[in-house]
């Protein structure tokens, strides 16, 4: 059975994410910073796994991020700034980073660096 390269990459990412989720869980004091990436956008949520609730969220679909000039990394940096601001407003200083099975580089690394620069600790 021959699969496309994109199908193989997707399955590999889901396997990596499943392995990661065995080890990573968020609490109310230290929620999980979940990253979801598509070809055009990036979405980030702070999730409390104990109650199953989303504490804060940010996305590149939001109006102030959509209007930015530049490539997708610039938007990822802005999304990182937004989620850090919203986390601080919710009284959160420390998070657990869940990269969602994506390799740590490019937009994911830019987002993580931006979150750290804006005051959240991993």
Curated annotation (Swiss-Prot):
Any one GO cellular component localisation term in the record: cytosolic large ribosomal subunit
A Pfam family that the UniProt record links to this protein: Ribosomal_L18p
Keyword Ribosomal protein attached: yes
Entry annotated with the keyword Ribosomal protein: yes
Signal peptide start-end: none
Swiss-Prot/TrEMBL keywords: Ribonucleoprotein, Ribosomal protein, RNA-binding, rRNA-binding
One GO biological process term: translation
Molecular function in Gene Ontology: 5S rRNA binding; structural constituent of ribosome
Assembly and oligomerization: Part of the 50S ribosomal subunit; part of the 5S rRNA/L5/L18/L25 subcomplex. Contacts the 5S and 23S rRNAs.
Protein family: Belongs to the universal ribosomal protein uL18 family.
Role of this protein: This is one of the proteins that bind and probably mediate the attachment of the 5S RNA into the large ribosomal subunit, where it forms part of the central protuberance.
This protein's name: Large ribosomal subunit protein uL18
Organism: Mycobacterium leprae (strain TN)
Encoding gene per record: rplR
